Each structure stands twice: as structure tokens, then as C-alpha cells.
Amino acid sequence: QTSSAKGARAVLRQLLQVRRKDLRLAIPAVKERTTGWSMGQHAEATASQWGVTREEQDVYAAESHRNAVRARAEEFYRSLLISPGLYPVDADTLPRDDSTIEKLARLKPAFDREQGSITPGNSSPLTDGAASVWVADAEGRHRLARDAPMVRLVDWEQAAVDIDAEGLLMAPALAIPRLLARRDLGYADIDLWEIHEAFAAQVLCTIRALEDRSWLRERARIDRELGPFPRERVNPNGGSLALGHPFGATGARILSQAAAQLATMPAGSRCVVSVCAAGGLGHVALLEAV
């Protein structure tokens, strides 16, 4: 209305009508639109369904922080950080070097306060942030900086789940085996796994599903042996539990982190990047070092 007002008086009249609440920023609700439940409530239900304990979640969360703190000390992230404007940023301050299983165990459940297992400590914190990646063909990549880490996008897969039957954040557990089966690969053929850690429970439930033959056969419709899942190859430089979850930018953050790690590995090394999303969606990509 102000832009269409004619004359200074008309503009001033419009500005005087602005109330304080009109300037208040809307805080996005982390809720599933189709159910009204928060993602944490959905993760609680899935953790109960798969029998993932509070202790398992806290152990995983502490490991995510340890990995991120080590990677920060080794300056792994330095090439991935861009300072905003006049404020220099050369390290991520979110990973905690004092995080322990004992400290995490003292935190109270956040979504089911009586019987829940998901706490602020084993959930990813929502953060302010942005991330970007370049996608180029063989010719276009020569226009990028020579020291930029580059990987090859080999294939990708998307999946969706029945939220009530399988759990809101479980679609990657369908997409991953389908992608691997199509490429005639097993779990051991993947040298690096970058899995979005929305919640420690969600990662652990996904891994359990990937190790469950009935899930693979009946839900993913994959009737082949993929082998034991290599948990030690998951998020070696920390994940969203330690680094945070900038809504809308996490996928690019994980892709850039995967590319930076793959760039240090031999040519032909493979990485699976996995991200769960609202609506029961899952997005998975297969990358390869060049």
C-alpha cells in the first residue's frame, strides 16, 4: 500500500498505521502439515516402533559432537566457510567439545515429557545459515576454481513413505537400497555415508531398517543381499546434531561436506548422501570421487 500511495502525506499516513506486531517475524513451525505433529513427535513414535533407546541416541549424539570437534581442530571445515560481510568466521562454534554421554543423559525429553527419549541433546538444533553448491557438466567445471573440491554425481533416488505405517522420516530407508540395487552395489561398496541427523533416533531407525531383511523385501521391494551396514563410515566429520540444521540449506551443506571429504579420498571412492524431509519424503544421491 505504501508503494502505491501518492504523495508524501499519503505515504506517511500508511506508515503510521503499521503496528508493532506487523514487524514481528513469523517463526516457522517444525510441524508436518498433514498430521499437525511436530517432527520430534513423529521421531518419538518411530523410535518406539523400532525399539531405539534413549542411551543409544545419546551415545550417537556424543559421537557426532566428537567427530565435529575433531574435524574443526583439523580445519576440515575451513574451506567450506564463507564469512558474512564484515564479521569474520573461521570456525563453527556449535559443536561442543564438552559434550558427554553423562551430560546428555541429564537432559529431559522435549516432545514426550513423561516417557519420551528425544531431548535437545540428541536432536539437531535449528540454526541460521545458508549453503550453496555448484552443479556443472564436464565442460563447465573448468570454469570453477581449481582448488574447489569436485565430485561426480552418479545417480539419485527419491522415495515416499506411508507416514502412519512407516514413519515420517523413514523414506531414505527405501531410497537407499533401491539406489544401490539399481547400481548393483552393496553397503560395503560405499566408502562414505553422509546422513542428515535430524534426530539421533531417526538415523538409528534408518540404519536398523537398512539391516532388516523383511523391511528390504516387503517395504523397499529389494530381494537381494546388501551386506552388513558399515556404521563406522557414517558422518566421520560430524553431522546435523553437532553442526545444526539450517532449514532449506541442510541438503547443500551435507553435499558440500561430502564433496570436501571425497576430495581427500582415492578416485572412484563412493559416497551416499541421504536427507529425510517433511511429507514423508527422502532424497538420496550417489557421489564418486574424481
Model-derived features: where do they sit?
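Active-site pocket-lining segment
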Residues: 162-242
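N-terminal extracellular/periplasmic Venus flytrap/periplasmic-binding protein-like
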Residues: 19, 56-143, 215-216, 220-233
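Conserved beta-ketoacyl condensing-enzyme motif
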Residues: 1-3, 75, 80-91, 188-210
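Cysteine-centered functional microenvironments
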Residues: 46-53, 58-60, 114-126, 189-199, ...
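Flexible glycine-/small-residue-enriched beta->alpha junction loops
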Residues: 1-45
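Short, well-ordered beta-strand elements within core beta-sheets of diverse protein domains
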Residues: 43-53, 133, 177-185
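Active-site-proximal alpha-helical scaffold in enzymes
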Residues: 47-76, 132-140, 207, 246-267, ...
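Condensing-enzyme catalytic core mediating Claisen C-C bond formation in acyl metabolism
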Residues: 14-28, 102-174, 178, 182-183, ...
